[in-house]
Each structure stands twice: as C-alpha cells, then as structure tokens.
Swiss-Prot record:
It comes from the Bacteria. One of its GO terms (biological process) is regulation of translational termination. InterPro entries: EF-G-like_DII, EFG_III/V, G_TR_CS, P-loop_NTPase, PrfC, RF3_C, RF3_dom_3_sf, RF3_GTP-bd. Keywords: Cytoplasm, GTP-binding, Nucleotide-binding, Protein biosynthesis. GO terms for molecular function: GTP binding; GTPase activity; translation release factor activity, codon nonspecific; translation release factor activity, codon specific. GTP binds at residues 19-26, 87-91, 141-144. Residues 10-278 form the tr-type G domain. Coiled coil: none annotated. Increases the formation of ribosomal termination complexes and stimulates activities of RF-1 and RF-2. It binds guanine nucleotides and has strong preference for UGA stop codons. It may interact directly with the ribosome. The stimulation of RF-1 and RF-2 is significantly reduced by GTP and GDP, but not by GMP. This is Peptide chain release factor 3. Belongs to the TRAFAC class translation factor GTPase superfamily. Classic translation factor GTPase family. PrfC subfamily. The gene is prfC. It is found in: Cytoplasm. One of its GO terms (cellular component) is cytosol.
Length: 527
C-alpha cells in the first residue's frame, strides 16, 4: 500500500463506550464530542421534556425515556486524529446490539460510577471484550459526589473484572472536597472549578509533591495526596502499554463528566494509547488494514433512522483499502457485484454523504432488504469476516395482531426490526402466530412502540412457555424427521434457519440427548 494510506489508517481510532446504566456514559459521549468540536453545547441526559436531547439518543422512545436504546455512531476530529465513536445502549437489557457493536471497534472506554463501583452490566460487557482481547481504558466518573475510596475502586476492578489496573491520574478529595486530579506521570496538578466553562480550573506543573506551593494551594489535603501517591508508588502497577494493548491491563483516569472535568486528559491519553485499526480475522485468513484491496463487514442494521423516508441503513466497518463514493464491490454472501452510490457518515441522526473512507471508519449504506448483519463486502476476493453472532433469546412473547387487516404490515415490521438484530422473529411450522425472542425484556416494549409509531400496527404480547431456543443443524433426513416429531416446538427464524424452542432446561437437555445426530447451537453466526 502507499504510504499515504498508512497515514490515513494510523490516524484513526474506532472505539465504543461501555458502562452500567446511569454511570454517565451518554454524558461523557457528549463531552468528548464537545472537545472534538462536533457539537456546540452538551445536552445533559435525563428523561425530561426539553427542547434539547442528548445528541446520541435520537429514537423517539429514547427521547421519551432518556435512555440509549440503539447504538449511535459519531465521527469527530481531535488533535489530528479521526475518531469514530460508537455509543452503545445504556439500558441493561440491550446486550445483543451492544455485543455486535463491540465486534466493530478496536478499543473500549469503560465508564464506572465511583459511588457504586463495578456493576453487573459492566461485568457482562467486559466478558465480551475479554473474548476479543480488546484494550480498555477506564474512567472513574462522578468524583464530584461522595463515593468509594479510589484505592477501593481499583481493588474492585481487579477482583470483580479480573483485570490489572494502572492509575494514570489520581483524585484530590471527592464530593464537596474534590479539588482536582494529579497526573502521576506528567506531574501536573489540574484544579477542579465547577464555575469554569469546562470544569477545568488552572493547570499547574509542579516539581514534585514536595513543592511548597502545594501546601499553600491544597492546605491539609496535600498530606492526603502525598500519602496516596507514596502508597501507589509502592503498590500500584506502572502503566504498561503492551499489557494494555493485549487487554490485560487498564489505565485508570478520575473525573466528573457532568462538569467536563478530567475528560480532556482522558481524550489526550486515548489518542496516545489506543490502537489504530487492527487486523481482522476471516474464515480463510487475517486481513491487514494496510492492504490495498477494499473489504469490510456489516455489524448493525437500523430501520427508520428517518421515519419520513422509511429507510434502512446498514452500518459497515471498513477493514482494509479505501472506500470511494460510487465504487463497485462484491457482496460475497449473494455472490454479486453492487455499486455503493450514497454512503453516509454519522453524527447521531445527522448524516453527511461520504466521498472517501478508510479502515476503521464506519459508513452507512442504504439497504433495501438485501444486506444482513455479518455480510462481507470485498473487491472480488471470497472472504467472510467472523465473530458476529446472534445469541439464543432468553425471553419470548407471542404476537397478537389487534387489527387483522394489518397482517402484511406486521410481517414487514417484525422482519425489518429483527434485521436490526436486537430482537429475533420466529414463524412456527404449525400455526400462524409469530413469536419474538429477545435477550432482554425492554426490547418487547421497544418493538411494540416501534410497530405502532413506525409501521402503524398495534399489537398485544402474550406469554409463551419457552425459556430458550437453539438453532438446529444436521443431515437433511434427520432434520426432516426432527421437524415431524417436534413440530409443535419447531420454528423458522428471520434468517430461514431451523430453531427449536424449549419450555425448560430439562426439556432442552432431554431433546439434545434424544437427537445425538443433530447439533443444537446456542449462537447463530450471521450467514
């Protein structure tokens, strides 16, 4: 590849923010965009009827509830770097969409509420990052409130997330006594000023912690800081970039996102530490971002980003080569060449037509139903990028249509919403009632709302006695025999794959035992 392409690749950073609900993820997203010049004014994020909602929460239901229920993609420039930020759903139900977003990024920012410490959703999401050895930077948020001791927070990560921590900044006090942070490597003391435009008061570079100026500025709190830093020098892990890039160590920063404090130091370090676009695995070989031929994959489909146009956008991660507007690419699953005329880049709901894009960039392609999650596009080579799964649903509902004349609109709505991958749709081999499955319960409320709001279809959901599903594969004759014998519990999913529904774990185990010639899969990689 030309050197010019290497420069383009190396200045890109593609990352997602993960956290437990209410840890301040959407607030920090807003503040990062503020520093990147992408927005002029950050909108505090909470459920309220205000004229201004958080930039990344654009769907109608999100605006009403003040939660992020879809993953937005935002692009901005900072210090010469092109940053692609993927905002993941903040409610603890939205795991599946989030899991897939994590397949499209090269690193992750983990936001932890310093009052509550590590919470369940953070744990779940970290497991997904660990599977992929994703590098993680940690931001301890809400230092302007009384929370847990900083050393206890580090201990919490090490014990609960089984990950080594390396503090980079250290807080001076907390809550009402919060004075700022001390950078353990640059020896800068950054003062917190709630009245300042971005929360940052003056920045003081000191000769060391024995500088008498500190006693003057911090009073008795300086003893606390000296004691903490002395402890850290003996007990804390020094930052090790290689361990961070291998997903084994997380550098830790402290601050208060709502006051924009500590966010700039975090962003500066992120640019320095986080990896540029990484090589990607396919079923046949590893693709380097520096290769000349173009390639990439779809990790998300979003219907009705613009309800006025009833459109569907496929979110696409570029893995190698250069994208140019109007280029022809091979859609490998369908085995045909397609022209990508109007690709877009995103700023939440705002879109701009893209003339060119590079590895690490996320572009949107208009989708008329032919693109599915996991689809690979190349300049001719038969590749398939791996690791974009569907998870077996844990919750199920039967869909009852309130107006029988709307059955076609219902089918269209269910299939389009299922294409986004947040819910799965199942049609029984016997009977006519659709069943939808989700990894989290809130998805049912989202589907009901969106069917009514976007497709003018009113439905009721009824409970069904299923607790899990498995995708079934095997020799054709055996599969046909299975379909006959288990017809009451066999469904076809939105991808046309055979699915077995089980009413209990015992029933599932028993069925697997009885049909040893067949394979029962807990995840279905998008084909």
């Amino acid at each position: 590849m030309q050197n010019h392409n290497r420069q383009e690749v190396d200045k890109r950073r593609t990352f997602a923010i993960i956290s437990h609900p209410d840890a301040g993820k959407t607030t920090i997203t807003e503040k990062l965009l503020l520093f990147g010049g992408a927005i002029q004014q950050a909108g505090e994020v909470r459920a309220r009827k205000s004229a201004r909602h958080a930039t990344s929460d654009w769907m109608e239901l999100e605006k009403q509830r003040g939660i992020s229920v879809t993953s937005s993609v935002m692009k901005f420039t900072y210090n010469g770097c092109e940053i692609n930020l993927l905002d993941t759903p903040g409610h603890n139900d939205f795991s599946e969409d989030t899991y897939r977003v994590l397949t499209a990024v090269d690193s992750v920012l983990m936001v932890i509420d310093s009052v509550k410490g590590v919470e369940s959703q953070t744990k779940k999401l970290l497991e997904v990052c660990r599977l992929r050895h994703t590098p993680i930077i940690t931001f301890m948020n809400k230092l302007d409130r009384e929370g847990q001791e900083p050393l206890d927070l580090l201990d919490d990560i090490e014990k609960n997330l089984k990950m080594q921590t390396a503090p980079v900044t250290w807080p001076v006090g907390m809550g009402k006594r919060f004075r700022g942070t001390y950078h353990l490597y640059t020896k800068e003391l950054i003062f917190f000023d709630a009245e300042a435009a971005n929360g940052t008061g003056r920045i003081l570079t000191i000769a060391g912690l024995n500088d008498p100026l500190l006693d003057e500025l911090l009073g008795s709190q300086v003893d606390e800081l000296r004691h903490d830093v002395e402890l850290l020098e003996g007990a804390a892990n020094p930052f090790d970039k290689e361990a961070y890039l291998a997903g084994q160590q997380t550098p830790v920063f402290f601050g208060s996102a709502i006051n924009t404090f500590g966010v700039q130091q975090l962003l500066d370090a992120f640019i320095e530490y986080a990896p540029a676009p990484l090589p990607r695995e396919t079923t046949t070989r590893v693709v380097s971002p520096y290769e000349e031929p173009f390639s990439g994959f779809t990790f998300k489909i979003q219907a009705n980003m613009d309800p006025a146009h009833r459109d569907r956008i496929a979110f696409f991660r570029i893995c190698s080569g250069k994208f140019t507007r109007g280029m022809k690419v091979r859609h490998t699953r369908l085995g045909r060449e397609v022209q990508i005329a109007n690709a877009t880049i995103f700023m939440a709901q705002d879109r701009t037509n893209v003339e060119e894009a590079w590895p690490g960039d996320i572009i949107g392609i208009h989708n008329h139903g032919t693109i599915k999650i996991g689809d690979t596009f190349t300049q001719g080579e038969e590749l398939k990028f791996t690791g974009i799964p569907s998870f077996a649903p844990e919750h199920f509902r039967k869909v009852r249509l309130l107006n029988p004349l709307k059955s076609k609109a219902l089918e269209k709505g269910l299939i389009q919403l299922a294409e986004e991958g947040a819910t799965q749709v199942f049609k029984p081999l016997m009977g006519a009632d659709w069943v939808i499955g989700a990894v989290g319960l809130l998805q049912f409320e989202v589907v009901m709302h969106r069917l009514e709001f976007e497709y003018s279809v009113k439905v009721a959901f009824e409970p069904v006695s299923y607790v899990t599903a498995r995708w079934v594969t095997g020799e054709r004759k055996k599969v046909e025999e299975f379909e006959k014998r288990e017809a009451m519990h066999v469904y076809i999913d939105g991808e046309g794959k055979l699915t077995y529904m089980a009413g209990s774990q015992w029933r599932l185990d028993n069925t697997i035992e009885s049909w040893k010639e067949l394979s029962f899969h807990e995840t279905s990689e998008h084909s």
